[in-house]
């Protein structure tokens, strides 16, 4: 029985996923297939490279090193400087273990939305560092805020436009069951509705009519995916973990709020760890109340936050 791991996006909300995955890595839980979407792609990279804490530190970087915000707008005239995050972080501020990643044996894919077709395409890379990073850039290139990324002769933007939670794709890849990490506390919370920005989208992507259609249909397709997820969860074929507290802004800059969501992801996964282990092994899940202690990594990072804030 093959189990896949699906990681939803959500920009800074991906810090919740980082907490969940750090707890899984501490317990040596790795799945043979992983698919990341948007910010979920960054989490997938650190999970496959087995770097506990890396994504959390990257998302909650000090303002002087952050890849988004007013500072970046003043420096590069963009609110989001993906080139800094994608091509600089892995070699400087937050070193990425390419060797472990490429030798992991895990099949990992990244969902990207093709501008020419409006469809989701899934990329993987097992040896080329630059191509891997370009794929990572494409999956999290937010419409209206980022330029399309050229890859293999076509252009791509955020994977969540065409497939926010690629459950069907994971099943097509041979997964019998899936673990899904969500970044929204409630399935009734819809993703960004780009139909509200119809005029802007039509103007900016007039050369990509299929992409415009994908933006307009996003919420409808998302709701269909949620219905499938709920069905699989009822059938015991999906293990879903999502925040149980009010979430933060997608571009939150308050380090303490960000760390609170990280700690929540970590401790929530800790509480449900035995339930997941039982589910992984096909046993009837048993809920185990294990509040535990605050993760040492979170405490260490809290100290970093205080130092960074002066």
In which residue ranges do the predicted regions lie?
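Patatin-like phospholipase
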Residues: 1-37, 45-310
């Amino acid at each position: 029985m093959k189990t896949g791991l699906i990681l939803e996006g959500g920009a800074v909300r991906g810090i919740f996923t980082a907490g969940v995955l750090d707890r899984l890595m501490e317990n040596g839980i790795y799945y043979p297939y992983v698919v990341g979407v948007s910010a979920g792609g960054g989490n997938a990279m650190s999970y496959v490279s087995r770097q506990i804490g890396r994504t959390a530190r990257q998302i909650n970087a000090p303002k002087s090193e952050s890849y988004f915000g007013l500072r970046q707008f003043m420096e590069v005239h963009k609110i989001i400087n993906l080139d800094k995050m994608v091509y600089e972080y892995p070699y400087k501020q937050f070193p990425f273990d390419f060797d472990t990643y490429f030798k992991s044996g895990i099949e990992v894919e990244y969902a990207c939305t093709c501008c020419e077709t409006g469809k989701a395409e899934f990329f993987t890379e097992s040896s080329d560092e630059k191509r891997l990073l370009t794929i990572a850039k494409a999956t999290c290139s937010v419409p209206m805020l980022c330029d399309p990324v050229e890859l293999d002769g076509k252009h791509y933007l955020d994977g969540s436009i065409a497939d926010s939670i690629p459950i069907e794709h994971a099943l097509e890849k041979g997964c019998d069951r899936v673990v899904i990490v969500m970044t929204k506390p409630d399935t009734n919370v819809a993703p960004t509705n780009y139909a509200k920005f119809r005029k802007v989208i039509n103007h900016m992507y007039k050369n990509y009519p299929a992409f415009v259609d994908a933006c307009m249909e996003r919420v409808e397709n998302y709701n269909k995916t949620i219905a499938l997820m709920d069905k699989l969860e009822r059938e015991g074929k999906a293990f879903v973990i999502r925040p149980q507290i009010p979430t933060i802004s997608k571009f939150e800059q308050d380090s303490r709020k960000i760390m609170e969501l990280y700690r929540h992801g970590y401790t929530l996964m800790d509480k449900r760890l035995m339930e997941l282990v039982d589910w992984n092994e096909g046993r009837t899940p048993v809920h185990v109340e294990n509040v535990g202690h605050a993760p040492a990594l979170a405490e260490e990072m809290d100290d970093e936050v205080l130092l960074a804030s002066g």
